[in-house]
């Protein structure tokens, strides 16, 4: 298992565009639409094998018959996305996800599409992050082919993605149980820390210099 992408929840893609331009000095490329969830996104490569995603409710899409992923319904209802996008969590790539995922009353395995892309996605049914964002949702791209290599590099480069939690030993044990490969080049960007509360820290090198963003725990 390895890190696949890091996700921000946004009020809208217009907000995400403005945020990226102000904080990073870049214009984010369009991704596409997710009919199953009624969402759309912006995506950009930030390291070999890793991309950054800003996701928002698609105002042109019909409301889905399920809770949207990345807690977008709750975050919008509570007004937590009014000021700026939130660093929500991350997604890990796990080959064979459809064979190995264990569904439960709290979790579900979905078949998802965006344009010509197809993938399996495993997450909490209520759309919330696991362990304040320290544990990932999981993805398995059809054919094992992540779209990251075809994504535009706009000058955002991942320096570090830190996971902090009061029970970090348990978090790491769960990741190890899922097959976390510490030697994988992508996973070397991920750091672990003890903390009083769950938190995420994303450090990016950007045209505006090095930028540190705090999030998680939402």
How would you describe each model-predicted region?
Residues 1-3, 9-27, 39, 46-218:
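Glyoxalase I/VOC metalloenzyme domain signal
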Residues 27-34:
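Conserved catalytic-core motifs of GNAT/GCN5-like acyltransferases
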